[in-house]
Swiss-Prot record:
Binds 1 iron-sulfur cluster per subunit. Belongs to the HesB/IscA family. This is Iron-sulfur cluster insertion protein ErpA. Iron-sulfur cluster binds at C56, C120, C122. It comes from Xanthomonas axonopodis pv. citri (strain 306). The gene is erpA.
Length: 128
């Protein structure tokens, strides 16, 4: 004789648009983006961060300036500067921080990604 057991259903995943800040865009990164936008002379630009296949670890980060925000893009604003992320990339970037660092070896945008299981030495590719 078998018994039918009703299991509780899982709560639906939160909509990324409803999460306060699913991705952190640091003040240092926003300041550098503002400087670069001023050099371009186009106040409509935002920095887009995205994930694509490639690199030595399977996925790699990409950055580009973009004037167009898609309806389903996440927009994170810091100090009046906007960072855009598409939903596909966001699933790999939830909880990450986009920062800008300067050191003796150079200056660069850095992503600190808690979802990355491994990263390559240059920090521009990762695996999940």
């Amino acid at each position: 004789m078998s018994t039918l057991v009703s299991l509780p259903t899982a709560a639906p995943a939160p909509d990324y648009q409803s999460i306060d800040r699913p991705l952190n865009f640091s003040v240092a990164a926003a300041a550098k983006v503002r400087e670069l936008i001023q050099e371009e002379g186009n106040a409509d630009l935002a920095l887009r961060v995205y994930i694509q296949g490639g690199g030595c670890s399977g996925f790699q980060y990409g950055f580009e300036f973009d004037e167009n925000r898609a309806e389903d893009d996440l927009a994170v604003a810091t100090d009046g500067v906007t960072l855009l992320v598409d939903p596909l990339s966001l699933q790999y970037l939830m909880g990450a921080e986009v920062d800008y660092t300067e050191s003796l070896t150079g200056a660069q945008f850095v992503i600190r990604n808690p979802n990355a299981k491994t990263t390559c030495g240059c920090g521009s590719s990762f695996s999940v």
